[in-house]
């Protein structure tokens, strides 16, 4: 099996794992999951939600996302900052393409590759990542894939 095909298979596995991780989110409008992988090891994870110590309610009475809700990417990157790991040169797998604010965090964290499975309504985050030289890959989430082929 060639290297490119092997990488594509790994990308699909990790994006499925990020999708499963998104199920931990308490947000009702949208559940997003993220994994940071380096040397084929998951070194951090995150999902969208409220900061530590806040009630796990992401939407207000008008069903709008509260302004202090953290995105999955931000949660994964801040976990790295509190650990002994480094995200320099890592790959981020995220179920929705990053917004512009998360793209800035990804760039500053030294992440070199971003794989996502769902398009966000704005493309400015993706454009910024590409402009900074980060490899950006879209892959469809294959929910019918079985690990037992």
Which functions belong to the PLM regions below?
Residues 1-149:
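Zinc-dependent deaminase catalytic domain
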């Amino acid at each position: 099996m060639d290297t490119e095909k092997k990488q594509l298979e790994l990308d699909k596995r990790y994006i499925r794992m990020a999708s499963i991780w998104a199920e931990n989110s308490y947000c009702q409008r949208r559940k997003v999951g993220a994994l940071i992988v380096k040397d084929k090891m998951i070194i951090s994870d995150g999902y969208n939600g409220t900061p530590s110590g806040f009630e796990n309610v992401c939407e207000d009475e008008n069903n709008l996302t509260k302004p202090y809700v953290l995105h999955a990417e931000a949660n994964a990157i801040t976990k790295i900052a509190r650990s002994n790991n480094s995200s320099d040169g890592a790959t981020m797998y995220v179920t929705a393409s990053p917004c512009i604010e998360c793209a800035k965090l990804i760039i500053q964290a030294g992440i070199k590759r971003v794989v996502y499975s769902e398009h966000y309504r704005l493309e400015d985050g993706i454009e910024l990542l590409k402009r900074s030289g980060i490899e950006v890959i879209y892959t469809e989430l294959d929910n019918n894939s079985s690990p037992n082929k």
